[in-house]
Amino acid sequence: MALNLKGKSFLKLLDFSPREIRYLLDLSRDLKRAKYAGNEVQTMQGKNVVLLFQKNSTRTRCAFEVATLDQGAHVTYLGPSGSQFGKKESVADTAKVLGRMYDAIEFRGYEQSVVEDLAKYSGVPVYNGLTNEFHPTQILADFLTVEEYKGNLKGLKFVFAGDTRNNVATSLMVGCAKMGMHFVGAAPKELWPSEDLVNQSKEIAKETNATISFVEDMKQACSDADVIYTDVWVSMGEPAEVWESRINLLKPFQVNMDAIKVAKPDVIFMHCLPSFHDLNTEVGRQIYEKFGIPEMEVTNEVFESKHSVVFE
C-alpha cells in the first residue's frame, strides 16, 4: 500500500507505524546526504512555517530554522515573550489564527494537550519540538545517528540511564518498541515511567520482536549495550529540594567508564544536551557548590571519549 504522510502532524511516536517512522528516517537520511553533496532540492518554496516556543531552546530552534530555510520556506519565530499564546488568547484561537497564515506550526512547550489542540484547531500540520510528555523529533535525530554508526536499528540494545519518566526517555522507549530494539531503562523504581505507557510499549514490542525492561542496577543494564543514553537529572525552575532528592536517587546511575567497560566495545554514548559534565556552566558550578559533585549525569571522561557521539 502506498505511503502518504502529507498533511499529517507529528505529535508523538505512538501515532506512527514502524513503516511510517522508517519512511521519515529514510527521508531524513536522503535530505542530509543531499545537503552535504550540495544538490538538495527545495521542496517548500513559497511555504511559511511558524516556530511557537513556550520554552527557550538552542538546538531545537536552530535545527528547525535551518531545515526550513534549506528547504526554501520562510520561517517566523515566536518565543516565550513574543505572542499572547496561552495568556490573552486561548490555544484554540491562536491555532486558528496561525493556521490561516502559515502552512505548518512547530511547537515547543509544556503540556502535550496544547500541541494536540494546535493540531486539532489549526488545520495545518503541527510538529512537536518538545512537551513535558514527549519529544518525538529528538528521537528521529537520535535514531538516524544510531543508524549511521550501527548500520541498522533492529535488535540493538538501547540503554537509557537516569530519570526514565522524562520526555526523551519515554519517547525513546516507544521508538525502540516501534523499531524492534531492546530498550532497557536504568533507574530507581521511583523514577520509572507510568505503567500505562510501559504496557503500551510492551504491546507494540510484541509485534516487532523488541523488548522493554527496567532495572535498578547500572552494571546489569549496560552489559553488552550497543547504545547508552542519558539526560540531565534536574531542570532549572525545579525547587532545590527536588534537586537534592533527585541527585541522591540518581548518583548510582551516572554514565561513567565503569558503564562503558561492561558494554560492547563499539558502544556509542548519546545525550540530547545540554549536559552537566564539567564545571563550565553556571548550573554545573551551582550543583558543585551545593552538592559537591563536579560531574552529574555523565563524567567528562565519557563525554569526551571516542564512544561519545553527542555532537553528531
Swiss-Prot record:
Binding residues for carbamoyl phosphate: S57, T58, R59, T60, Q84, R108, H135, P136, T137, Q138, C272, L273
Organism, as annotated: Mycoplasma capricolum subsp. capripneumoniae
Annotated GO CC locations: cytoplasm
First-tier enzyme category under EC: transferase
InterPro entries: Asp/Orn_carbamoyltranf_P-bd, Asp/Orn_carbamoylTrfase, Asp/Orn_carbamoylTrfase_sf, Asp_carbamoyltransf_Asp/Orn-bd, Orn/put_carbamltrans, OTCase_ArgI
UniProt GO BP: arginine biosynthetic process via ornithine; arginine catabolic process to ornithine; citrulline biosynthetic process
NCBIfam families per the UniProt record, alphabetical: orni_carb_tr (TIGR00658)
Subcellular location: Cytoplasm
Protein family according to the UniProt entry: Belongs to the aspartate/ornithine carbamoyltransferase superfamily. OTCase family.
Reaction equation(s) it catalyzes: carbamoyl phosphate + L-ornithine = L-citrulline + phosphate + H(+)
Ligand binding (L-ornithine): N167, D231, S235, M236
Gene3D superfamilies: Aspartate/ornithine carbamoyltransferase (3.40.50.1370)
Protein name, per record: Ornithine carbamoyltransferase, catabolic
Molecular function in Gene Ontology: amino acid binding; ornithine carbamoyltransferase activity
Role description: Reversibly catalyzes the transfer of the carbamoyl group from carbamoyl phosphate (CP) to the N(epsilon) atom of ornithine (ORN) to produce L-citrulline.
EC number: 2.1.3.3
